[in-house]
C-alpha cells in the first residue's frame, strides 16, 4: 500500500530493526539498513522532513548467553559490538541521524514511562505461569535459554519464537519438550508470577490498524491470521538480571526485568528524542512524530483525524519480526497514548550462492570482509537494492556481483558519464552554451515523476533503477547522434547533443544519490557543482550545470576475474573448515561417550540430547509413515517459510503445509520422494488445512526418502 500524500506537512522518521549486539554484521543484516538509508534519502529528496534512526539491541538472552560464554558482563559484551556497528554502518554510507542503544539512559527512562502508562490505564495484569527451569543449574530458562518443539507447527523452536517454522511468537511455557541450552538437559516447568500486557484490549484497534497500514503486503497480511482469534496477552517480564528493570514504583515487579521486545522498539522513540535533543526541536521535533498533535491520547480506539496531526512513522525490518512490529508494537504505542506506524516494510532474506546464509557453517559474506576486499560500499548498496523487490529474497554471489557491477555500473552508467563529460571538457571546457532539447527535458521530467512515484510506493528497487534507465537512455542518445562526427560537419548540433548529455549526467547524479550516495557526490564534484548533492531537491536535475568543469575520471572501476576467484575460494574454504570443525566436535563428543565414529566425509549437526522417555513397540506401530511423492508445491501467501504441498501417498493425494520455503526451491520439489507422517493430527496454518507431516532432518530440512523406489503408499516399519 502506498502513501500518495508524500511530502506531508508533518515530519517523518525512518527506523531500522535493531541489530542484536552479540555478533558481527554480515550482508544479510545490511540489507535492511541499506534499504532504510536509501528510503530516508529519497524522502528528503522529494521535500519530506525526515530523520533516520536506529540503535543496538543490548538486552535479551542472546546477549546474556554469549557474554557468559566469553566470561564478561553483558553490558561490556554488548557495548563492544555496539561500538563496532556504529563504526561499520557509515563505511557502507548508512548514515543515521542518531544511533543509540537500548541500555542508554534515554531508552531506559522512556521504557519505564511506557510501562507506567500501561499500568495506569489498566492494560497490565499479573498472573502465575509455567516457566521452563533447569534443575541442574536451579534457575529459570527465559527465551533462548530453552529450545524445544513449536506447539503450533511442530518445528524446532526457541523459547520465545518459532524461528524455524511458522514464525509465531511463543509465550513462556508454550514450548513443548523443552531443553535447557545451558546444560542440554530436559527442562521442567515451574510456576512463577509475571506481568502481562492485555493485548485483547487492542484487538479491534489492531484490526483497523492493519487496514490502514502501508508498506509491504507481507507486513499487512501475515499478522491478520494472528489476530483473527482471541489475542493472547503478552508476557512483558522475565526472570533475568540483564535488561531494563520493571519500574520500582509499580507494585509487584521486584527482581523482574522487562522482556527485550518491550524496550527494543521503544529505542526507536528514544533515538528520535536524542536526535531532537542534539539539533533542537526547531529543526526536528520528536514529539510531533511520535505523539498525536504532540500530546498523548490514551484509549483503545483510533480517530482517523489524528493522522493529520501526527508524524509519519516508517519501519524497515526483517520479515522474521513482523509480528513484533505489526501486533505488539502498535498495541504498546496505543496503550501509552502514542502515534501509530504509517508503514512497515518487511525485507526478504539474503542467500549466499543459491543457499541459505548460515553463520554456523560460515556460509556468509561479512561486512568487514567486503570492505577489506577494497570494493566501494555503493557497489554493494546497488546490488542489494536492485537484486529483488524489497519483500523478496536476494541471492548474493561474488560472480553475480562482478557481472552486475561490470555490466550495469561500469558498462552503462560509468561509460555514459565518462565519455559525455570528457567530450564536453575537451571540446567546450564544460557545459556547452545551448538550451536543453525538449525531448531530453521531457525524459528527465518523466524520470523525476517516476522517482516521486517510487518513493510513494516505497519501491527501493525502482528508486535505484530510475537513474540506471536514464543513463541507458543517455547511452542510446549519444550513440545515435554521434557528436564526434558532428563537431566538424554540424558544430551547432554537436553542442546540442553534448549539452543534453551533460544535463542527463547531472540528472543521473541527483536521482542515483539515495542508493549510490558516495558515487553521486563524486560525480557532483566532477560537474563542478557547489555544495553537496545530498542537499538538493529533484528540481535541480533540470537546472543548468556549471559552464566549466575539469577533466573527469572514471566513476566506476572494473571488477577483475582474479579478485573474484580469490574471494570465491576463500568463501569455499571457510565453509569446508566450518563443516570439518563441526564434524570433529561431534566426533569428539561421540568418542567420549564410547560410540563408534564414521570417518567418512559427512556433515554432522550439533546434536540435541536423546529423549529419555521410551515408547513401546505398540506405540510405534501406531505411527503411520508412508512413502509419498510431491506433486506440486507453492508458497503460502503471507507466510515466509511455508509451502503448500500436494503429496501422493498411493491411496490418495494429501494437502500438507510444510516449513520448507526458505530451504528448498518450490519449483524443483515436484517429483521428490518423501516420507509422510500420515496419521498426524490435522492442523490449520494460515487458513490452510495440513493433513500430515513431511519428515526432514536438521536445520537445513534435509528431506527423508527411501534408498530404492518403494511404491507410493508403502508403510515405513
Curated annotation (Swiss-Prot):
EC no. given is 6.1.1.10
Location in the cell reads:
Cytoplasm
User: Where are the compositionally biased (Acidic residues) regions?
Assistant: 593-603
Q: Cofactor note from UniProt?
A: Binds 1 zinc ion per subunit.
RNA-binding keyword on record: yes
Task: Give Gene Ontology CC terms.
Answer: aminoacyl-tRNA synthetase multienzyme complex; cytosol
The UniProt annotation places Zn(2+) binding at 150, 153, 162, 166
Where is the motif named 'KMSKS' region mapped on this chain? 356-360
Summary of the function given for this chain in its UniProt record: Is required not only for elongation of protein synthesis but also for the initiation of all mRNA translation through initiator tRNA(fMet) aminoacylation.
Protein name (database record):
Methionine--tRNA ligase
Provide the gene name from the record: metG
Amino acid at each position: 500500500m502506498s502513501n500518495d500524500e508524500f511530502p506531508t506537512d508533518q515530519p517523518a522518521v525512518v527506523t531500522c530493526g535493531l541489530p542484536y549486539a552479540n555478533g558481527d554484521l554480515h550482508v544479510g543484516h545490511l540489507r535492511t539498513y541499506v534499504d532504510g538509508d536509501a528510503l530516508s534519502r529519497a524522502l528528503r529528496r522529494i521535500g519530506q522532513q525526515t530523520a533516520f534512526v536506529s540503535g543496538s539491541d543490548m538486552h535479551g538472552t542472546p546477549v546474556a548467553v554469549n557474554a557468559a560464554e566469553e566470561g564478561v558482563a553483558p553490558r561490556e559484551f554488548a557495548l563492544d559490538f555496539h561500538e563496532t556497528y556504529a563504526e561499520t554502518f557509515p563505511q557502507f554510507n548508512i548514515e543515521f541521524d542518531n544511533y543509540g542503544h537500548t541500555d542508554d539512559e534515554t531508552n531506559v527512562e522512556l521504557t519505564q514511562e511506557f510501562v507506567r502508562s500501561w499500568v495506569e490505564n489498566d492494560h497490565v495484569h499479573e498472573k502465575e505461569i509455567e516457566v521452563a527451569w533447569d534443575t541442574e543449574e536451579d534457575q529459570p530458562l527465559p527465551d533462548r535459554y530453552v529450545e524445544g518443539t513449536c506447539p503450533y507447527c511442530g518445528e524446532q523452536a526457541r523459547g520465545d519464537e518459532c524461528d524455524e517454522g511458522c514464525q509465531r511468537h511463543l509465550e513462556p511455557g508454550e514450548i513443548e519438550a523443552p531443553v535447557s541450552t545451558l546444560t542440554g538437559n530436559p527442562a521442567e516447568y515451574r510456576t512463577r508470577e509475571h506481568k502481562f500486557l492485555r493485548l485483547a484490549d487492542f484487538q479491534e484497534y489492531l484490526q483497523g490498524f492493519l487496514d490502514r497500514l502501508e508498506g509491504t503486503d507481507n507486513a499487512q497480511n501475515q499478522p491478520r491470521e494472528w489476530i483473527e482469534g482471541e489475542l493472547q496477552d503478552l508476557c512483558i517480564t522475565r526472570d533475568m538480571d540483564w535488561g531494563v528493570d520493571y519500574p520500582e514504583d509499580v507494585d509487584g515487579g521486584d527482581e523482574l526485568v522487562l522482556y527485550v521486545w518491550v524496550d527494543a522498539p521503544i529505542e526507536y522513540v528514544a533515538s528520535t528524542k536524542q536526535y531532537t535533543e542534539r539539533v533542537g526541536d526547531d529543526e526536528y521535533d520528536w514529539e510531533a512524530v511520535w505523539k498525536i498533535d504532540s500530546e498523548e491520547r490514551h484509549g483503545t480506539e483510533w480517530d482517523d483525524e489524528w493522522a493529520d496531526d501526527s508524524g509519519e512513522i516508517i519501519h524497515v525490518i526483517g520479515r522474521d519480526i513482523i509480528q513484533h512490529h505489526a501486533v505488539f508494537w502498535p498495541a504498546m504505542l496505543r496503550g501509552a497514548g502514542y502515534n501509530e506506524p504509517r508503514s512497515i516494510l518487511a525485507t526478504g532474506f539474503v542467500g549466499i550462492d543459491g543457499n541459505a546464509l548460515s553463520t554456523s557453517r560460515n556460509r556468509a559474506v561479512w561486512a568487514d570482509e567486503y570492505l577489506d576486499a577494497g570494493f566501494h560500499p555503493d557497489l554493494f548498496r546497488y546490488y542489494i537494492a536492485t537484486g529483488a523487490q524489497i519483500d523478496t529474497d536476494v541471492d548474493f554471489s561474488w560472480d553475480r556481483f562482478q557481472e552486475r557491477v561490470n555490466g550495469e555500473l561500469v558498462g552503462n552508467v560509468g561509460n555514459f558519464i565518462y565519455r559525455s563529460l570528457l567530450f564536453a571538457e575537451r571540446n567546450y571546457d564544460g557545459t556547452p552554451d545551448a538550451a536543453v532539447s525538449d525531448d531530453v527535458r521531457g525524459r528527465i521530467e518523466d524520470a523525476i515523476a517516476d522517482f516521486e512515484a517510487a518513493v510513494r510506493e516505497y519501491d527501493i528497487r525502482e528508486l535505484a533503477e530510475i537513474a540506471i534507465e536514464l543513463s541507458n537512455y543517455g547511452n542510446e542518445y549519444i550513440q545515435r547522434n554521434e557528436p564526434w562526427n558532428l563537431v566538424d560537419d554540424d558544430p551547432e548540433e554537436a553542442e546540442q547533443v553534448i549539452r543534453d548529455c551533460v544535463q542527463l549526467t547531472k540528472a543521473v547524479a541527483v536521482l542515483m544519490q539515495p542508493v549510490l550516495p558516495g558515487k553521486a557526490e563524486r560525480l557532483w564534484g566532477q560537474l563542478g557543482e557547489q555544495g553537496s548533492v545530498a542537499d538538493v531537491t529533484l528540481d535541480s536535475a533540470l537546472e543548468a550545470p556549471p559552464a566549466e568543469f575539469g577533466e573527469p575520471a572514471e566513476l566506476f572501476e572494473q571488477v577483475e576475474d582474479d579478485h573474484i576467484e580469490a574471494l570465491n575460494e576463500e568463501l569455499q574454504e571457510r565453509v569446508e573448515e566450518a563443516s570439518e570443525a563441526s564434524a570433529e566436535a561431534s566426533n569428539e563428543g561421540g568418542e567420549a561417550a564410547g560410540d563408534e565414529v564414521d570417518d567418512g566425509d559427512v556433515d554432522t549437526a550439533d546434536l540435541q540430547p536423546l529423549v529419555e522417555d521410551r515408547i513401546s513397540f505398540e506405540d510405534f506401530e501406531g505411527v503411520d509413515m508412508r512413502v509419498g511423492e510431491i506433486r506440486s508445491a507453492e508458497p503460502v501467501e503471507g507466510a515466509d517459510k511455508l509451502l503448500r504441498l500436494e503429496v501422493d501417498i498411493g491411496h490418495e493425494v494429501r494437502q500438507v503445509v510444510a516449513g520448507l520455503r526458505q530451504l528448498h526451491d518450490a519449483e524443483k520439489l515436484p517429483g521428490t520422494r518423501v516420507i509422510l507422517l500420515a496419521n498426524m493430527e490435522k492442523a490449520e496454518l494460515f487458513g490452510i488445512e495440513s493433513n500430515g507431516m513431511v519428515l526432514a532432518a536438521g536445520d537445513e530440512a534435509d528431506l527423508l526418502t527411501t534408498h530404492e523406489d518403494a511404491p507410493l503408499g508403502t508403510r515405513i516399519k
